[in-house]
Swiss-Prot record:
This is Prostaglandin G/H synthase 2. Homodimer. The modification S-nitrosocysteine is found at residue 526. Belongs to the prostaglandin G/H synthase family. S-nitrosylation by NOS2 (iNOS) activates enzyme activity. S-nitrosylation may take place on different Cys residues in addition to Cys-526. The gene is PTGS2. It is found in: Microsome membrane; Endoplasmic reticulum membrane; Nucleus inner membrane; Nucleus outer membrane. One of its GO terms (biological process) is prostaglandin biosynthetic process. It holds the Pfam family An_peroxidase. Glycans are attached at residues 53, 130, 396, 580. Its main location: membrane.
Length: 604
C-alpha cells in the first residue's frame, strides 16, 4: 500500500525543469554549470567579462571591443586598396607585422588543449587524451533540452531531404565570382583527406586520422604497415610503375594495399596510394600521382647531396620536406586565393617564435562538417575537348591514363568551380551526401548557427533575411525553423549570403580560418626545434620548402610544365554560366559516389 502511494505521489509531482544551461545563458565563452535542477552558475574566468551571465566587459575588454573592427570591415580593407597593399607587400618589416597579426588573431580562437567531444559536454580526461575522437569547438546540446537547439525553435527539426531539395539543390550552375577552378577543388579534396577520416563504424564523432593535422598520411598511409607496403625500400623512394614513359602509382596487386574499388575496375587500373578512397575520381588520383613523383624527386635530390644517408633517413627527411611544401602551398596559394586578399600571405614559421604558441592540433568535428564544399562541383568535368558526367568519371582511372597529367592540369585550371555560399548550387549527383552531412550534424548535436557565430566573436544574425540576404528562402526557412536562433549550422553555411564577389559567406570564413591556420602553423615542423635546415637535409632541402608553390610542384613533376593556378585566368568566366544546369543531368540522381565513400571510411 505504501509503495502504491509512493508511486502515486511521484506521478503527480511536477517533472524537473529543463536543464538551465539549455538556454546558453553564459555569454563570451563563459562556462555554464547547473546547480540543482533549475539554477545555474556562469564561470567567467579569464574571459575578460564578468556578471551573472559573463556579459559585462572589463575595462580593457571594453577598450579592445571599441577598437576592434568587424570581420566584414577587415575583409573589405584586405580585399580593396590594391595599390596600398602592393606597397605594403614590398616592405618586409611591415608585411611581417601584419602577417604575425593575421596568424595570431586567427589561431588564438582555437586554444589547445582540446575541450569537448561528441560524448562529453564538459572537460574530461577522455576528451583530452582519446585521439580517436574529433574535438569540438562547442559542446553538444544536452539530451534533456526541450528542443534540438536548446530551448529555441520547434521540438523537431525539418526533414533533411526537404532542406536539401528546397535550399541546397542546384537549379542552374552558379560559377564562383572569385574564379575558383577545379584544380583548386580537387586539391582541397585531396589535401583534407589526410585529416578528415571519419570512422563511420563508430560514428561521425570519431576519426581514423590520429595525426590530427598535416602529416601526409594520404600519401604515405595512416599505419606503418600500409606505409611499408607502399615503400620501395631503396633510396628512400615509394613504389611506382612506368606507363608510356611516365610515373604512376603501383597497383593494388603489386602492393597488397587495401583500396576501395568496385568489382568492375580492372586490376591494372586499381592504383594503390596512401588514402584508401583516392580511387574514387581521377582528380584525386592526379594529385596522388603528383605527390608520389615529388617524393621520389626529392629523394633523388637528397641522395645527391647526402650520399651517405641510408634508405630510412632519405625517406624520413623527404617526408618532412613534403609536409613543409604542402603547408607553404596551402598558405601562399590555396588560402590566399580563398581569402581574396591583396595582402600577400606568407609562410614563415619564425614570425611566431617569440609568441606564446602551442605546436599541437586536434581536428574538430565542426571543421570537418563545414568543409563539405559540394557546390564547387560542376555538373560535368571537361578535360581537353571531352566532357564527362559523374557516372563516367567515378572510379575511372583510365581517364587519367588517356589524357595524362598535362591535360588534366591544363583543363582543370581552365574550368570554373561553383560558388559555395548563397544556396541552391549543389549538384544532383551528391544530394544524398548533403543529407548525410545534415543528419550527422544532428546526430552529433551541434549547437545553432548563432551560437557558433558568438563562439568565434561574430555578431549573431537577428533574422533569416539577414542570414540569406533575400526574402524567398528566408521566409521558407522561418516557416521550418521558427527562430533564427534555432537555425542549424551546416545548412546555414550554404544558404548564407556570400560576401561581395566571394565564394563564401562571413560565417564560413570566420569559423574555418582559425581552424585552418592553427592546424597549419601548429604543425611540429613549424616549431623552433624543428624549423632548421639540418632537419630537412640541409640548405638544399630547406630551399625546396621555401620556394614551393603549386606552379613549381606541377613544373617539377608534370611534362611540359603546364600553367597552373587555383583560379581561372579569364575574368569573363566568373561572370557567365559555362556549364549546363543540373536539370539536363537529372538522370544522375541514382548514382551517389560520395555515399559509397561514406559507407567505407571518409567524406568527400
Amino acid at each position: 500500500m505504501l509503495a502504491r502511494a509512493g508511486l502515486l505521489c511521484a506521478s503527480l509531482s511536477p517533472p524537473h525543469a529543463a536543464n538551465p544551461c539549455c538556454s546558453n545563458p553564459c555569454q563570451n565563452q563563459g562556462v555554464c554549470m547547473s546547480i540543482g535542477f533549475d539554477q545555474y552558475m556562469c564561470d567567467c574566468s579569464r574571459t575578460g567579462f564578468y556578471g551573472e551571465n559573463c556579459s559585462t566587459p572589463e575595462f580593457l575588454t571594453r577598450v579592445k571591443l571599441l577598437l576592434k573592427p568587424t570581420p566584414n570591415t577587415v575583409h573589405y580593407i584586405l580585399t580593396h586598396f590594391k595599390g596600398v597593399w602592393n606597397i605594403v607587400n614590398k616592405i618586409p618589416f611591415l608585411a611581417d607585422v601584419i602577417m604575425k597579426y593575421v596568424r595570431t588573431s586567427r589561431s588564438h580562437c582555437i586554444e589547445p588543449p582540446p575541450t569537448y567531444n561528441v560524448h562529453y559536454a564538459y572537460k574530461s580526461w577522455e576528451a583530452f587524451s582519446n585521439l580517436s575522437y574529433y574535438t569540438r569547438a562547442l559542446p553538444p546540446v544536452a539530451d534533456d533540452c526541450p528542443t534540438p537547439m536548446g530551448v529555441k525553435g520547434k521540438k523537431e527539426l525539418p526533414d533533411s531531404k526537404e532542406i536539401v531539395e528546397k535550399f541546397l539543390l542546384r537549379r542552374k550552375f552558379i560559377p564562383d565570382p572569385q574564379g575558383t577552378n577545379m584544380m583548386f577543388a580537387f586539391f582541397a579534396q585531396h589535401f583534407t583527406h589526410q585529416f578528415f577520416k571519419t570512422d563511420h563504424k563508430r560514428g561521425p564523432g570519431f576519426t581514423k586520422g590520429l595525426g590530427h593535422g598535416v602529416d601526409l598520411s594520404h600519401v604515405y598511409g595512416e599505419t606503418l604497415d600500409r606505409q611499408h607496403k607502399l615503400r620501395l625500400f631503396k633510396d628512400g623512394k615509394m613504389k611506382y610503375q612506368v606507363i608510356d614513359g611516365e610515373v604512376y602509382p603501383p597497383t593494388v596487386k603489386d602492393t597488397q594495399v587495401e583500396m576501395i574499388y568496385p568489382p568492375h575496375v580492372p586490376e591494372h587500373l586499381r592504383f594503390a596510394v596512401g588514402q584508401e578512397v583516392f580511387g574514387l575520381v581521377p582528380g584525386l588520383m592526379m594529385y596522388a600521382t603528383i605527390w608520389l613523383r615529388e617524393h621520389n624527386r626529392v629523394c633523388d635530390v637528397l641522395k645527391q647531396e647526402q650520399g651517405e644517408w641510408d634508405d630510412e633517413r632519405l625517406f624520413r627527411r623527404s617526408r618532412l620536406i613534403l609536409i613543409g611544401e604542402t603547408i607553404k602551398i596551402v598558405i601562399e596559394d590555396y588560402v590566399r586565393h580563398l581569402s581574396g586578399y591583396h595582402f600577400s600571405l606568407k609562410f614563415d614559421p619564425e614570425l611566431l617564435f617569440n609568441q606564446q604558441f602551442q605546436y599541437q592540433n586536434r581536428i574538430a568535428a565542426e571543421f570537418n562538417t563545414l568543409y563539405h564544399w559540394h557546390p564547387l562541383l560542376p555538373d560535368t568535368l571537361q578535360i581537353d575537348d571531352q566532357e564527362y558526367n559523374f557516372q563516367q568519371f567515378v572510379y575511372n582511372n583510365s581517364i587519367l591514363l588517356e589524357h595524362g597529367l598535362t591535360q588534366f592540369g591544363e583543363s582543370f585550371s581552365r574550368q570554373i568551380a561553383g560558388r559555395v555560399a548563397g544556396g541552391r548550387n549543389v549538384p544532383a549527383a551528391v544530394q544524398q551526401e548533403q543529407r548525410a552531412s545534415i543528419d550527422q550534424s544532428r546526430q552529433m548535436k551541434y549547437q545553432s548557427l548563432n551560437e557558433y557565430r558568438k563562439r568565434f566573436s561574430v555578431k549573431p544574425y537577428a533574422s533569416f533575411e539577414e542570414l540569406t540576404g533575400e526574402k524567398e528562402m528566408a521566409g521558407e526557412l522561418k516557416a521550418l525553423y521558427q527562430d533564427i536562433d534555432a537555425m542549424e549550422l551546416y545548412p546555414a553555411l550554404l544558404v548564407e549570403k556570400p560576401r561581395p564577389d566571394a565564394i563564401f559567406g562571413e560565417t564560413m570564413v570566420e569559423i574555418g580560418a582559425p581552424f585552418s591556420l592553427k592546424g597549419l602553423m601548429g604543425n611540429p615542423i613549424c616549431s623552433p626545434d624543428y624549423w632548421k635546415p639540418s632537419h630537412f637535409g640541409g640548405e638544399v632541402g630547406f630551399k625546396i620548402i621555401n620556394t614551393a608553390s603549386i606552379q613549381s610542384l606541377i613544373c617539377n613533376n608534370v611534362k611540359g610544365c603546364p600553367f597552373t593556378a587555383f583560379s581561372v585566368q579569364d575574368p569573363q568566366l566568373t561572370k557567365t554560366v559555362t556549364i549546363n544546369g543540373s536539370s539536363s543531368h537529372s538522370g544522375l540522381d541514382d548514382i551517389n559516389p560520395t555515399v559509397l565513400l561514406k559507407e567505407r571510411s571518409t567524406e568527400l
